[in-house]
């Protein structure tokens, strides 16, 4: 435990210094917008809205269903991010989720050389996006159904992919069950891009997001849609849980 607490201290010092130059909330200095980890039980830590369970290898935080129909580019964003094209929204700051994942030992992609990829998703950015790497993670959502019974599902089961072919009619298929990639975002021009853009998790390749989609079709911004047959009602509260897969 002493070694782990030392890691926490070092990570917090690093994160506080790294994020000190990112834009602060209006009328607040940057130092006040970053929460220090607090141990609430043996091996369990909270960073603001984010909870880290070291033994379970999980990071959890509150979110809510944001869309029940339509085209998606993101799985999860903040309310200040591109919420008009995201399945979930969460008030948890991406920088605090990132610190929580660092506490679990997650590793993302290398810092990209081209800062131009920090922009929003479009055909040009997709064409020049690097091949993304990172640790594999599983993402689940916990919510209560109409009867008040707790349910747990893999988040990809609330997503479908539309496959368009010149040779036959378009086909809609469920998103494949499987891991996501913790790519970890990056810094550019003294900004942590996931925090600046409010981008937790992208369905369409976006290096600025903390999490990316490794499935076929992730390089196309017209293929991913809400699975309106299975997604809970809009604004349904969920607990978003990220589990780091064994390496």
Please place each PLM-identified region on the residue numbering:
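N-terminal secretory signal peptides that target proteins for export/translocation
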Residues: 1-5
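Bacterial N-terminal signal peptides
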Residues: 6-17
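Boundary at the C-terminal end of the N-terminal hydrophobic targeting segment
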Residues: 18-20, 24
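Long, low-hydrophobicity ectodomains and other hydrophilic envelope-associated domains
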Residues: 27-247
């Amino acid at each position: 435990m002493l070694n782990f607490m030392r890691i926490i201290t070092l990570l917090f010092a690093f994160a506080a210094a790294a994020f000190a130059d990112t834009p602060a909330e209006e009328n607040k200095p940057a130092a006040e917008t970053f929460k220090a980890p607090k141990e609430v039980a043996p091996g369990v830590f909270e960073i603001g809205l984010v909870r880290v369970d070291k033994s379970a290898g999980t990071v959890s935080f509150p979110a809510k269903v944001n869309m029940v129909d339509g085209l998606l580019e993101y799985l999860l964003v903040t309310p200040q991010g591109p919420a008009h094209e995201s399945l979930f929204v969460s008030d948890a700051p991406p920088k605090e989720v990132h610190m929580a994942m660092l506490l679990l030992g997650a590793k993302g992609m290398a810092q990209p050389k081209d800062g131009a990829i920090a922009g929003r998703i479009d055909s040009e950015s997709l064409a020049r996006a690097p091949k993304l790497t990172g640790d594999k993670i599983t993402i689940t959502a916990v919510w209560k159904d109409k009867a008040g019974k707790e349910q747990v599902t893999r988040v990809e089961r609330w997503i479908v992919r539309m496959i368009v072919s010149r040779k036959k009619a378009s086909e809609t298929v469920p998103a494949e069950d499987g891991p996501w990639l913790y790519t970890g975002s990056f810094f550019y021009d003294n900004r942590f891009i996931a925090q600046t853009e409010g981008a937790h998790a992208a369905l369409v390749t976006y290096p600025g997001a903390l999490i990316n989609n490794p499935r076929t079709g992730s390089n196309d911004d017209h293929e991913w849609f809400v699975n309106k047959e299975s997604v809970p009602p809009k604004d349904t509260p969920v607990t978003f849980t990220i589990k780091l897969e064994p390496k």
